[in-house]
Amino acid sequence: MSYRELVAELPREHAEALSDALVELGALSVSVEDADADTPDEQPLFGEPGLVPERTAWQHSRVIALVDATQDPAVLLAAAANEAGLAQAPRFELREVEEQDWVRLTQSQFEPIHIGEKIWVVPSWHDAPQPDALVLELDPGLAFGTGSHPTTRLCMEWLEQTVQPGQTVLDYGCGSGILAILAKKCGAGRVTGIDIDPQAVEAARHNSERNRADVTYGLPDDCPDGEFDIVVANILSNPLKLMASMLASKVKPGGRIALSGVLARQADEVASVYARYIDIAVWREHEGWVCLAGTRRESH
């Protein structure tokens, strides 16, 4: 079966309605992009968690619908525009989509990732290249964290060097569960992963089962009382600052904490918030992102 992309540009107030109508009328997929991307008029859409976004749609949007090549694009777009309440259908262009083995193409884009000394993040269709590797089998999915992002990589390198056998570990903002799973494979004892997203929690549980890693996952209200030998939080700078007191309280006196999701220019500000609880500093920087790490003082 062959496909084409139907591409239309229109104001933000119509983009979502047209997208929904295209899906209802048989488009195989629909995406919305900033039509001004990579120009001086490009508009960042979302800010960090904890901040109210300035806008929820791009002023000038590009709607891209993947359609069966047998469909008449003009008829489809006219019907979608009518369904969406537009006065008339927007102008559009068609792009031919080359026939592909989509499964093979997707798999080829995700090769094993080597991190630290012995860590390999390996999709299920690959074998680990290193016989004595710490292997995490993880396929791309809904939850953040496959080892490709600099912040995930930094936290994994830190855990590989830090975790000692039997230590308790809290992964706050666990996403795919990759850090919690790694901690367990590094010999940790009780490991807990917490995330605000129920989908992430389910994905993390699935990934732990595949990796035969005994990790307990839950939402923030499920976070156990008590302290941990190690706390790792790969989130973003604003929520890290807002949760400083809580996260610091989860670290045992003398225990270790690592924070990432922090840009290099944000490091001093985040570190200053944690300084009242933790002796903390930049541990390592990679591609403009940093991992802050430190030890909780015996009393605070």
Curated annotation (Swiss-Prot):
Classification via CDD domains: AdoMet_MTases
Alphabetically ordered keywords of this record: Cytoplasm, Methyltransferase, S-adenosyl-L-methionine, Transferase
Cite the SUPFAM superfamilies for this sequence.
S-adenosyl-L-methionine-dependent methyltransferases (SSF53335)
Record localization: Cytoplasm
Gene3D superfamilies, sorted: Vaccinia Virus protein VP39
Q: Which domain of life is it from?
A: Bacteria
Question: Which GO terms are recorded in the biological process aspect for this UniProt protein?
Answer: methylation
**Enzyme Commission identifier(s):** 2.1.1.-
The reactions it catalyses are:
L-lysyl-[protein] + 3 S-adenosyl-L-methionine = N(6),N(6),N(6)-trimethyl-L-lysyl-[protein] + 3 S-adenosyl-L-homocysteine + 3 H(+)
In alphabetical order, the GO MF annotations are: protein-lysine N-methyltransferase activity
GO terms for cellular component: cytosol
Which residues hold S-adenosyl-L-methionine?
152, 173, 195, 234
- Enzyme kind, highest EC tier: transferase
Stated family: Belongs to the methyltransferase superfamily. PrmA family.
* Protein task: Methylates ribosomal protein L11.
Question: How is this protein named in the record?
Answer: Ribosomal protein L11 methyltransferase
Origin organism is Burkholderia pseudomallei (strain 668)
Quote the gene name from the UniProt entry.
prmA
